[in-house]
Each structure stands twice: as structure tokens, then as C-alpha cells.
């Protein structure tokens, strides 16, 4: 866009169209009256100043729209911005873009910072040498310039410490003539200038905040920041050395053994481990060996062998697990063996009812006297096999039917056994169950 030939480029200025008639194609005012160059320049000065202000305002409006879009701000809320605000926002945005580019360059190539710092130090030394050789320069200007260069060099050192790319980065970065990572400044020490611009990192004391040591400093953009020193690579202090035969070594060995015993609790005895057994763990049947062959578990004629289910899954509830454990211990005792010979409970191969069933059964015990029925014709199985108990009405009815079929073969008195089975089924069906 040609700002020189466009008078009405900005709405803020009321430029009349009368001025455009006296201008030629090249944008300069013609001389119809034969005025001199001085008079013509004096006549053209207000018009050129108005054009210059129009160009500035037009560029500021363009810059305002661009910076609001870049900073993701609503233009409707920032309709009236001063020229200084627009310029400040532009400077901050360009500084942030520059920092982002520097970070990207550092991530892609860590040696970029080293190269930049080396070149900056060389240029700063050349400027300092040139200023010191020139005559007629004020001492205050020379001091402020040297202090500013020192501050910039220290800012570059802070960037190198924050990048944290190599271990020996701060030690061997500059040549022998340049500044090093030591507290010595880039140039010889100079007194404080009038504007106090020589505030560097070495002069700033460390502060404690929240248990952390922070160093106040300034970023290259001029912003104030608190930097945490790099202590991540520091190794922990070694512990005190103790000879193996000394008392300290024995105490250290005892302490390590105690810690190992706490961390690895495999040395617990059987008494302690018995209390750690969960209620959901399945008890081990001690009446039958675990490695008993199948050919040794035989049954007598007229006796049906029930299938054995080796399952590692937990029982349905802790109550059934505890009750089955108690029933196994009762079945393994000799008193229960003697009682099973003189009762109808030894005739049936199904396991006894659970504790919940017996508690709600109003008929009492099912054991009869030895004179009412003789079960000598049917002997109990060789091994008591554990079965998982299912507390449901259908499972109880199924066990009653199986018991009725088996008792028909083993019973000596057929009518009495059927009568007993009918009574047991009637009592079990009439019993109230919570489920």
C-alpha cells in the first residue's frame, strides 16, 4: 500500500481531498505559481507531517489487530488502546517468541548456547577495548556500558545453568581470555553507575523460601526471576566406615539383619502363620494324604464313589469355609466314627448340613439309637472326601434324592429306611431358611 499517495488512509485524520488536486503523479506538490524551493518546502511541510501521522496510525492499527490475535485476546474488549500499550505488547510478544526460538534451538543443538556466549563475550571485549582507547568519552558512560555488558554476560551464564545440558558446561566454556564460571566478572570491577545497572548474579544473595535456596536474578528479557541452583548431580554423602570386626560393624550387621527380617517375613513359625490364614483360604484335609493314588481309594460293592473336585477357588462365604473346616476335624476324630456306625448319618454319603441349616432345623438331631436300625451291612468309606457345600434349595433336594437312591442298596430294612427318608425330606422342606 502506498502511504505517500493515500491521504485518507486513516479515519483519525480529516484529510481533505483538495490537497490531492495540487499533487502530481509522483506524490510531490506542483509549482503552478512559480514559488521558490524554500517556499514550496514550507508549504508542503504540514501536508507531509499529516501524511506521516496517517502512516503511523495505520501501522499501529494493523499492529494492534495482529498483536491481539497473536496473544489470543478479544478485540471487542480492547477497542481503545494507547499507542504506548500497543508498542509494549508488541515488544513483550517478540521477546517471548525469541525465548521460544532459543529454547527450540537449545533442544535441537545444545552447543548453540555455547557458540552464542562465546561470540557475545568476544564482541563485548572488543567494545570495551574500543571504548577504553577512545578519548573524550565520559567516564560515567564508559562505566554504564561496561556494567551493562557484565549484566548481559551473567544473564547468559544463568541461561546456561538453567539449560543443564552438560556437566562441565560452566567450567570450560570460554577461552582463557574470556570470562569463566568463577565469581570474577567479565571485565575489571567498576564502581556502581548512576542507574544501578551493575546488579549481577554474584552480588545477589541467596534467599530461603519454603526450604529451598533461591537466587534472585534477571532474565535476558529484563524480567525478574528466582533461580534454584543446580544440585541434582551432587552425590549423597558417604556413610561412616566401620571395620567388620569392630563393635560398630557388628551393630551395623545386626541392624541390617533386623531390617532384612522385617522386609522379608518368611521366617515366621507355624504358630504365627496359622493366625495369618484368611477366612477365605481353603483348609487342608489331613485325613487323606495329598499324594494318595486313585487305585487305593476303593469302595465296597453297593457303594457309589463321589467325584472329587480339586479347586483352588475360594468358597462361597467365610461361614461355609469355617463350617467345612470344623466338620472335617469332627469327621477325622474317632468319636464321630463310632457315632456314625450307630446312626443313619453314616449310611448317607452326602456331607452333613451346614451350620446355618442345622441352626434353623427345628427337628433336632437326626441320629437314632443303635437298636432302631443296624447299619452293619454298609461300612463307611475308606477316606472322607471334602466337597464344596452349596447352600441352595435345589442342591439340598438333589442330595436327598441321591441319598435315597444309595440307601435303597445299603439299607437292611427297606420300609423303615424309606419311611425315615420321607420324614427327613418333609422336615428339610418345612425348615425356614433366610435365603
Curated annotation (Swiss-Prot):
Top-level division of the source organism's lineage: Eukaryota
Locus of motif WRPW motif: 432-435
UniProt note: phenotype after gene disruption: Lethal at different developmental stages. In late third instar larval brains, results in a complete absence of type II neuroblasts (NBs) and a reduction of type I NBs; after larval hatching, loss of neuroblasts in the ventral nerve cord and specific loss of type I neuroblasts within 48 hours; in the pupae, results in a premature loss of mushroom body NBs. Escaper adult flies display weak motor activity, lethargic behavior, and shortened life span. RNAi-mediated knockdown of the protein in type II neuroblasts lineage results in an increase in the number of type II neuroblasts.
GO MF annotations, alphabetized: cis-regulatory region sequence-specific DNA binding; DNA binding; DNA-binding transcription factor activity; DNA-binding transcription repressor activity, RNA polymerase II-specific; protein dimerization activity; RNA polymerase II cis-regulatory region sequence-specific DNA binding; sequence-specific DNA binding; sequence-specific double-stranded DNA binding
Low complexity bias locations: 18-27, 311-324
Extent of Polar residues compositional bias: 355-378, 385-395
GO cellular component terms attached to this protein's record: cytosol; nucleus
Domain (Orange): residue spans on this chain: 116-149
Pfam family, one: HLH
Modified residues (Phosphoserine): 407-408, 411
SUPFAM superfamilies linked: HLH, helix-loop-helix DNA-binding domain (SSF47459), Orange domain-like (SSF158457)
Annotated ranges, domain bHLH: 40-97
Key words, A-Z: Developmental protein, Differentiation, DNA-binding, Neurogenesis, Nucleus, Phosphoprotein, Repressor, Transcription, Transcription regulation
Role, per record: Transcriptional repressor of genes that require a bHLH protein for their transcription. In the larval brain, required to maintain the self-renewal and identity of type II neuroblasts by regulating the expression of the transcriptional repressor erm together with other self-renewal transcriptional repressors such as klu and E(spl)mgamma-HLH. As part of its role in neuroblasts development, has been shown to be a direct target of the Notch signaling pathway, however might work also independently of N/Notch. In the developing larval and pupal brain, required for mushroom body differentiation.
Domain notes: Has a particular type of basic domain (presence of a helix-interrupting proline) that binds to the N-box (CACNAG), rather than the canonical E-box (CANNTG).
Binding partners and assembly: Homodimer. Heterodimer with E(spl)mgamma-HLH and E(spl). Transcription repression requires formation of a complex with the corepressor protein Groucho. Interacts (via bHLH motif) with sisA. Interacts with da.
Name under which the protein is recorded: Protein deadpan
Species of the source: Drosophila melanogaster
Lineage of source species: Eukaryota, Metazoa, Ecdysozoa, Arthropoda, Hexapoda
Gene name per UniProt: dpn
Amino acid at each position: 500500500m502506498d502511504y505517500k499517495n493515500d491521504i485518507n488512509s486513516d479515519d483519525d485524520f480529516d484529510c481533505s481531498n483538495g490537497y490531492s488536486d495540487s499533487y502530481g503523479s509522483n506524490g510531490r506538490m506542483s509549482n503552478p505559481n512559480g514559488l521558490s524551493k524554500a517556499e514550496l518546502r514550507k508549504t508542503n511541510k504540514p501536508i507531509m507531517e499529516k501524511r506521516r501521522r496517517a502512516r503511523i496510525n495505520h501501522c499501529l492499527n494493523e499492529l494492534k489487530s495482529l498483536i491481539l490475535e497473536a496473544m489470543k485476546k478479544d478485540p471487542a474488549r480492547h477497542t481503545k488502546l494507547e499507542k504506548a500499550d500497543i508498542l509494549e505488547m508488541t515488544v513483550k510478544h517478540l521477546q517471548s517468541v525469541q525465548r521460544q526460538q532459543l529454547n527450540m534451538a537449545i533442544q535441537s543443538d545444545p552447543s548453540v548456547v555455547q557458540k552464542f556466549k562465546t561470540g557475545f563475550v568476544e564482541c563485548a571485549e572488543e567494545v570495551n577495548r574500543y571504548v577504553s582507547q577512545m578519548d573524550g568519552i565520559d567516564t560515567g558512560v564508559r562505566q554504564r556500558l561496561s556494567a551493562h555488558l557484565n549484566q548481559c554476560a551473567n544473564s547468559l551464564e544463568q541461561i546456561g545453568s538453567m539449560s543443564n545440558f552438560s556437566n562441565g558446561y560452566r567450567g570450560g566454556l570460554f577461552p582463557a581470555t574470556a570470562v569463566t564460571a568463577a565469581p570474577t566478572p567479565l571485565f575489571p570491577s567498576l564502581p556502581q553507575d548512576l542507574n544501578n545497572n551493575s546488579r549481577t548474579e554474584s552480588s545477589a544473595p541467596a534467599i530461603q523460601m519454603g526450604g529451598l535456596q533461591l537466587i534472585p536474578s534477571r532474565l535476558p528479557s529484563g524480567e525478574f526471576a528466582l533461580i534454584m541452583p543446580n544440585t541434582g548431580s551432587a552425590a549423597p554423602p558417604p556413610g561412616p566406615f566401620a571395620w567388620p570386626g569392630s563393635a560398630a560393624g557388628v551393630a551395623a550387621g545386626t541392624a541390617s539383619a533386623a531390617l532384612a527380617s522385617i522386609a522379608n517375613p518368611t521366617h515366621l513359625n507355624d504358630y504365627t502363620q496359622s493366625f495369618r490364614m484368611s477366612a477365605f483360604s481353603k483348609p487342608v484335609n489331613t485325613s487323606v494324604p495329598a499324594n494318595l493314588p486313585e487305585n487305593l481309594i476303593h469302595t465296597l460293592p453297593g457303594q457309589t464313589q463321589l467325584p472329587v473336585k480339586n479347586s483352588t477357588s475360594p468358597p462361597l462365604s467365610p461361614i461355609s469355609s469355617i463350617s467345612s473346616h470344623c466338620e472335617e476335624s469332627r469327621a477325622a476324630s474317632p468319636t464321630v466314627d463310632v457315632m456314625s456306625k450307630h446312626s443313619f448319618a453314616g449310611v448317607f454319603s452326602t456331607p452333613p448340613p451346614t451350620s446355618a441349616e442345622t441352626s434353623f432345623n427345628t427337628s433336632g438331631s437326626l441320629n437314632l439309637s443303635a437298636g432302631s436300625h443296624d447299619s452293619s451291612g454298609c461300612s463307611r468309606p475308606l477316606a472322607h472326601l471334602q466337597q464344596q457345600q452349596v447352600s441352595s434349595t435345589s442342591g439340598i433336594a438333589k442330595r436327598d434324592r441321591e441319598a435315597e437312591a444309595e440307601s435303597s442298596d445299603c439299607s437292611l430294612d427297606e420300609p423303615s429306611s424309606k419311611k425315615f427318608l420321607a420324614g427327613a425330606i418333609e422336615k428339610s422342606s418345612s425348615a425356614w431358611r433366610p435365603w
